[in-house]
Design a protein with these regions (language model features):
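A compositional/biophysical signature of low hydrophobicity enriched in polar/charged and small residues
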Residues: 1-169
Length: 169
């Protein structure tokens, strides 16, 4: 689980770190040796930078990015949950949500709800099954769901790293 980190929690990232990150984001299979050759730096330098970026939480994963639609879950929805307030905060609800494979993300939010989740289903009927399972928790008092018709801008970090590289020079 990750939390929102403030500016003081920012790990120092320099221009070489940004170049390494951009290379991995645009060519995920390049590997350390290929990256070192492409960037013109020693293999050990790239490996040390990657180790530090992982250790400091900048690079969260080297895992492949799986498209839920490509594995049979083409319907995406976002649910805003209102949570019964009490001891333990959101922990019991988060534990409940973590047990549901179709819940891809959960975020504590401000505004009209308490938790925003992203869920997937095989079709609308399956999505309803997932929603029913989500709200089948005593701590969830209300849920509001919107179905995504199309993803116009997918999760992305390349422009952010490019901006960081441009401003770090």
């Amino acid at each position: 689980m990750t939390s929102a980190a403030g500016p003081s929690a920012r790990a120092p990232v320099d221009a070489l770190d940004c170049r390494i990150l951009l290379l991995l984001l645009t060519e995920p299979g390049i590997g350390v040796l290929g990256a070192s050759r492409r960037l013109g730096v020693a293999r050990g330098t790239v490996q040390a930078r990657l180790d530090r970026l992982q250790r400091t939480g900048v690079l969260r994963s080297m895992a492949p990015d799986v498209d839920p639609a490509a594995i049979g879950y083409p319907v995406t929805a976002f649910c805003t949950l209102e949570i019964r307030q009490g001891r333990g905060g959101h922990s019991p609800v988060v534990d409940h949500l973590a047990a549901i494979p179709e819940v891809l993300e959960a975020h504590t939010i401000t505004g009209s709800g308490d938790v925003l989740i992203r869920i997937v289903g095989r079709d609308n009927a399956d999505l309803q099954r997932v929603i029913d399972r989500v709200v089948d928790d005593a701590h969830v008092t209300r849920a509001s769901t919107v179905i995504s018709l199309a993803t116009r801008l997918d999760h992305r970090t390349i422009p952010l790293v490019e901006h960081l590289l441009d401003t770090s020079s």
